[in-house]
Amino acid sequence: MSDFSPIAGRAPRLAVLIDADNVTARNASAILDEIASFGEPSVRRVYGDWSSSALTQWKEQARDLGLVMHQQSANTKGKNASDIGLVIDAMDILHAGKVDGFVLVSSDSDFTRLASRIREDGLQVIGIGEAKTPESLRKVCNRFVLIENIVSGSDTPTQPKSGRTSDVQAVKEPPLKAIPFILDAMKKIDPDQDDYSLGHLGQAITQLHPDFDPRTYGSSRLSDLLRKIERFEVFTQGSSVKVRDKA
């Protein structure tokens, strides 16, 4: 699942910056497990006003998961203080040059410019947030992962439980809805090509649609999703896995 390649025989070092005001504490462990698939979270910080009773659960999770809590008092009018503190720290980390990429955990569009600025320096940005996250933040990241996909698994399509609005709950889409994204990627690679490398196809999909995730369609992997769609054929050619559009 990782979009990062090993660097000098080691896993990429990631700066994980969490906006506690916009992420539910109960999902913290699952989110960190997801992040581990991309690299080593060498910087692990969570931002919020820790004097607020609303972040009690986050305090417990931070201690259990080894997250460094950064205090941001809510004394800034017109702008969330946690946002400002996170952005300042992110720029300090960026200029220090000790990490290979960033993971921004928030559903707040205010971090769109930060993600863009980090990418301008050649580092990759992974965004993690809820389905309510605006397109502006999703699209500026190299990869954007929905918390609903992280915590719900990839089983059969589900509907959100009534009366549980505080819990993120994935609504799985039918596999056929993934077809336009797959065809976009094939066109990007070569519209006249007969067969496509599964790996290259996955990379092209992510480049065009950073928030694409097979789990949205009830599959844990792209190959599993493709096999559910009759239009596509997945086959092995030598040591490579290939995909063909039969239409």
Give the ranges of each region predicted by the language model.
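Domain-level signal for Mg2+-assisted phosphodiester chemistry and nucleotide/NA-binding surfaces
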Residues: 1-95, 124
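Conserved acidic residues
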Residues: 14, 100, 142
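Short, ordered loop/turn segments at secondary-structure junctions
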Residues: 20, 74-75, 107, 130-131, ...
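Acidic beta-strand-to-loop metal/phosphate-binding motif
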Residues: 47, 100-107, 114, 118, ...
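Intrinsically disordered, low-complexity glycine/proline-rich and charged
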Residues: 116-156, 232-242
